[in-house]
Structures are given as structure tokens and as C-alpha cells.
């Protein structure tokens, strides 16, 4: 089972690929897709999808999992995040991948044991749980690893 974890965002999206072979988890790759707020939104969404498409074609995941969205007090921010999520879900559908969503607190609790963990705690635990992740310093990237990890350890596939 190969899972693509995505921490959805328009400005700085984290992605990670984690595999489960027998009972062992294996970190394969991760990264961050950054877009500029100066660019038009349709160009930003297209760029995000073009990078994620390359990841899908290279690693051939069986499933994609994304963090559920909470409603932000700023409706414009929520709407833009909704655009990003919709574009990502469309890409996932185009490649006929199964998809799961997890609440942020579920991800935090699975990775750290505490549902209200801070970003640095998630980053620290990911490095302990998955060999190969020591070089990760970006919290969006770490969140994406945590999302994929949550899917695999909760056997939600």
C-alpha cells in the first residue's frame, strides 16, 4: 500500500509518500509546493496540480489522504482553501485513487498521542517514527507525512 498524504493549502502545500510493506512503514518522499499570492488563482491551482500529478506518476500511490478543513473566520481564506482542496480532489479522482480525509486532531493524536499538539511536536515525532525523515524542517511537509502515517497506522484504507 502506497499513500500520498497532502496538507492542502494554496500558498504552501505539503505532500508526502509513505508505503506499508508487510507490517513495516517506509518513507519514500515528500516536499512542499509553494505558490505566490501575486499569481492568479487559476495559475496557482494549475501549478499545484501539475506537481502533484508528477508525484502520482512517479510513486503510483494506491490512495491519497488529505487533512479535513476547518472553517476559518476569514471567509476569503476558507474559500481559497476550498479551491485548492477541490482541485486536489479532482486530480485524485482523475487517477482513480481511493481517498480518505482526517481531522487535524486525529492526525495529531495518532502521531504524538495528544490531539492538540503543536507543529514542532509533530515534526519531532515524525522524525522518530519514520526513518529517512530527519532532513524535514518544513511543518507543511511534516504534516503531510503525518497525514499519510495516520492513514496507514489506523488501517483506514
From Swiss-Prot:
Q: Which cofactors, by name?
A: Mg(2+)
Q: Which PROSITE patterns match?
A: RUVC
Q: Where in the cell is it found?
A: Cytoplasm
CDD domains noted in UniProt: RuvC
- Pfam short name (any one): RuvC
Q: Which SUPFAM superfamilies match?
A: Ribonuclease H-like (SSF53098)
InterPro entries from the UniProt entry: RNaseH-like_sf, RNaseH_sf, X-over_junc_endoDNase_Mg_BS, X-over_junc_endoDNase_RuvC
- Residue positions of the active site: 7, 67, 140
Q: Where does Mg(2+) 1 bind?
A: 7, 140
Could you tell me the EC number(s) of this protein? Answer: 3.1.21.10
> Where is it predominantly found?
cytoplasm
**What is known about what this protein does?**
The RuvA-RuvB-RuvC complex processes Holliday junction (HJ) DNA during genetic recombination and DNA repair. Endonuclease that resolves HJ intermediates. Cleaves cruciform DNA by making single-stranded nicks across the HJ at symmetrical positions within the homologous arms, yielding a 5'-phosphate and a 3'-hydroxyl group; requires a central core of homology in the junction. The consensus cleavage sequence is 5'-(A/T)TT(C/G)-3'. Cleavage occurs on the 3'-side of the TT dinucleotide at the point of strand exchange.
Q: What is this protein called?
A: Crossover junction endodeoxyribonuclease RuvC
Originating species: Rickettsia bellii (strain OSU 85-389)
Gene name, please?
Answer: ruvC
